[in-house]
């Protein structure tokens, strides 16, 4: 007869504790890169849409992650991750 495998892995942090820590880290990073009024408006939107629920926390985490990713990818002045924009000659001299 088959038996379920025993849980021999390391003890995991509770999901809600981990989620709240992640949200705090994202909020502190977002404050460095976006105007506070934008973040306040986003928080109001999330609260009006989801209320004070875990679904709202998860939605806020997802949106902040997406905003920060795009912000860094476009080329944040504070980061080395962004795309480096290169000026191209318009006279065709760089063509082979």
UniProtKB/Swiss-Prot annotation:
Posttranslational mods: Phosphorylated on several residues by host. These phosphorylations regulate VPR activity for the nuclear import of the HIV-1 pre-integration complex.
Keyword Transcription: yes
Superkingdom of origin organism: Viruses
UniProt keyword list: Activator, AIDS, Apoptosis, Cell cycle, Host G2/M cell cycle arrest by virus, Host nucleus, Host-virus interaction, Ion channel, Ion transport, Modulation of host cell cycle by virus, Phosphoprotein, Transcription, Transcription regulation, Transport, Viral penetration into host nucleus, Virion, Virus entry into host cell
InterPro entries the UniProt entry points to: RetroV_VpR/X
Key word Endoplasmic reticulum present: no
Coiled coil region boundaries: none
Localization in the cell: Virion; Host nucleus; Host extracellular space
Region (Homooligomerization): 1-42
Post-translational modification Phosphoserine, affected residues: 79, 94, 96
Chief location category: virion
GO biological processes: DNA-templated transcription; monoatomic ion transmembrane transport; protein homooligomerization; regulation of DNA-templated transcription; symbiont entry into host cell; symbiont-mediated activation of host apoptosis; symbiont-mediated arrest of host cell cycle during G2/M transition; viral penetration into host nucleus
One GO location term (cellular component): host cell nucleus
Additional notes on this entry: HIV-1 lineages are divided in three main groups, M (for Major), O (for Outlier), and N (for New, or Non-M, Non-O). The vast majority of strains found worldwide belong to the group M. Group O seems to be endemic to and largely confined to Cameroon and neighboring countries in West Central Africa, where these viruses represent a small minority of HIV-1 strains. The group N is represented by a limited number of isolates from Cameroonian persons. The group M is further subdivided in 9 clades or subtypes (A to D, F to H, J and K).
Chain's role: During virus replication, may deplete host UNG protein, and incude G2-M cell cycle arrest. Acts by targeting specific host proteins for degradation by the 26S proteasome, through association with the cellular CUL4A-DDB1 E3 ligase complex by direct interaction with host VPRPB/DCAF-1. Cell cycle arrest reportedly occurs within hours of infection and is not blocked by antiviral agents, suggesting that it is initiated by the VPR carried into the virion. Additionally, VPR induces apoptosis in a cell cycle dependent manner suggesting that these two effects are mechanistically linked. During virus entry, plays a role in the transport of the viral pre-integration (PIC) complex to the host nucleus. This function is crucial for viral infection of non-dividing macrophages. May act directly at the nuclear pore complex, by binding nucleoporins phenylalanine-glycine (FG)-repeat regions.
Family: Belongs to the HIV-1 VPR protein family.
Assembly description: Homooligomer, may form homodimer. Interacts with p6-gag region of the Pr55 Gag precursor protein through a (Leu-X-X)4 motif near the C-terminus of the P6gag protein. Interacts with host UNG. May interact with host RAD23A/HHR23A. Interacts with host VPRBP/DCAF1, leading to hijack the CUL4A-RBX1-DDB1-DCAF1/VPRBP complex, mediating ubiquitination of host proteins such as TERT and ZGPAT and arrest of the cell cycle in G2 phase.
Protein name as catalogued: Protein Vpr
